[in-house]
Amino acid sequence: AERLLFVFGGGACVGADVTRKALKALGAASFTTYAGRGIVGTDDPLHFGAALSQPSSADVIGSADVVVVVGSELAEVDLWRAHLGHQSLLVRVDIDPQAFTNTDAGVLNILCDGPLLMRALLERAEAMDKSASGWSADEVAKSRAVWRADTDAARPGIALLCDALREVMPDDTMIYSDMTQFAYVAQDVWPMTKPGHWHHPYGF
């Protein structure tokens, strides 16, 4: 795949270091769900962030030639739409067979532990010396800028408050949010350096 895209959910939080190395070795782009924030490093130029709820993220996903979803049920509160947006092969990876609810044609379900898969892909990519990418850092940065502007326009001023608060918070702060405007914006614009450090009541 030239435009390989991963989506990481909360079930992929273990082994983030290996996941980050695998993404780089594969030249892959990525999204996370809200529960998966922090799995991908904030310095990864091909990371689109936790932006699946942005309507135009479906267009980005549709431009990938393979989409791999690891450790996520793709909940309604992550997408806010009926379809992820993929136009090619979708691979679902999970240890829970009940997560394989997608009945679309062209879906490959793999019952497997996500971290084990990422380690295997890393080893394979390094053996093949596969690091070229069909994605560019510029297109990712442009998408992220548009999505931040859209979020700020919908709830003005909160994104700047998020930036200011994040500047004075330790990286290992454990955050628990509730159903507030601040939390909704922060989930979109607050980059996490570690997985499993922001907890929000999904599926209420």
Language-model region placement:
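Glycine-rich, acidic loop regions that bind phosphate or pyrophosphate groups
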Residues: Y34-D138
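Active-site diphosphate/adenylate-binding microenvironment
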Residues: E139-F204
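Glycine-rich phosphate/diphosphate-binding loops and the adjacent beta-loop-alpha structural elements
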Residues: E2-V14, Y176
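Short glycine-rich anion-binding loops that position phosphate/pyrophosphate groups of nucleotides
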Residues: G10-A12, G36, S72-A75, T180-F182
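Redox- and metal-dependent alpha/beta enzyme cores, enriched for Fe-S-associated oxidoreductases
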Residues: G15-A35, T173
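Active-site glycine- and acidic-residue-rich loops that bind
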Residues: G9-A16, A154-A159
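Glycine-rich phosphate/diphosphate-binding loops that line cofactor/substrate pockets in enzymes
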Residues: A1-L5, I61-S63, A164-T173
